[in-house]
């Protein structure tokens, strides 16, 4: 079902902006300062703003987690020790099967290809955004998730080797996955990649596709009604039809 929870959305945006500021700051730091940044990142995992999120630090050279917050168990049923032992391979166990296939076969390769064309300075400014579903391997509960991640440091050849990320329960749930790549330029952002993969077997009308695009941007039904010069009731009817098709 497509829905919006404004309070939770504001909380996510506030935490994400704090994370972005941290990442912007390390772009000008010396290598020896990275360790203190990572320790600060870990400490934020237990504060009130991030208690309902998963924060992680991933070593991109050996694809092992250097840190994962304890809240990972509530989302996935897995304990931090499982993440440390299995590394990135654990994703196939905690992400819904069809989502994992779409991410690994389509979105990840395309997003990485875009980023490899960027300069080192631009890579420091990259923010990845992913929408998918986690599945708790103990309870079977499926949770829509939005994940934001960025590169934290690079080796001498300009290759990223440390990535930090945050996962939240998403305020938007749809039958598919989405991947975005943005460049953080001060107060402005440029989206350089945005693709959504739907699993629907039904054909959406042009109006329904437009409404989905608005919803993915975080617009509410009143805003959509005003922009498209239709009644709020019509927007709600479209959303019900979209839900049935998805």
Task: Put a short name on every predicted segment.
Residues 9-11, 148-163, 170-176:
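Short loop/turn elements at sensory-signaling interfaces that couple input to output
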Residues 184-207:
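Regulatory hinge/linker segments at domain boundaries
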Residues 218-246:
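Recognition helix of helix-turn-helix DNA-binding domains
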Residues 33-90, 185-193:
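PAS-family sensory domain signal
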Residues 1-35:
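Short, low-complexity N-terminal regulatory "tails/caps" that precede and couple sensory modules
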Residues 208-215:
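Short alpha-helical "packing" element that flanks the helix-turn-helix/winged-helix DNA-binding module
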Residues 79-148, 215:
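PAS-family sensory domains
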């Amino acid at each position: 079902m497509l829905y919006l929870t404004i309070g939770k959305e504001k909380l996510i945006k506030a935490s994400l902006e704090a994370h972005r500021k941290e990442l912007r700051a390390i772009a000008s730091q010396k290598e020896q300062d990275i360790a203190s940044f990572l320790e600060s990142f870990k400490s934020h995992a237990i504060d009130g703003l991030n208690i309902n999120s998963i924060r992680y630090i991933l070593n991109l050279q050996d694809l092992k987690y250097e840190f994962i917050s304890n809240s990972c168990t509530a989302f996935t049923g897995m304990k931090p020790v499982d993440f440390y032992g299995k590394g990135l391979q654990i994703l196939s166990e905690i992400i819904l099967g069809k989502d994992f296939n779409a991410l690994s076969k389509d979105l990840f390769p395309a997003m990485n290809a875009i980023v490899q064309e960027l300069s080192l300075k631009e890579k420091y400014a990259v923010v990845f955004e992913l929408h998918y579903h986690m599945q708790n391997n103990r309870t079977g509960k499926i949770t829509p998730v939005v994940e934001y991640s960025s590169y934290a440091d690079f080796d001498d050849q300009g290759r990223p080797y440390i990535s930090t990320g945050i996962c939240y329960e998403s305020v938007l749930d749809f039958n598919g996955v989405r991947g975005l790549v943005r460049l953080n330029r001060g107060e402005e952002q440029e989206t350089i990649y945005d693709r959504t993969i739907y699993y629907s077997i039904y054909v959406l009308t042009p109006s329904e596709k437009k409404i989905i695009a608005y919803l993915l941007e975080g617009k509410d039904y009143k805003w959509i009604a005003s922009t498209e010069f239709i009644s709020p009731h019509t927007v709600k009817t479209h959303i019900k039809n979209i839900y049935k098709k998805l």
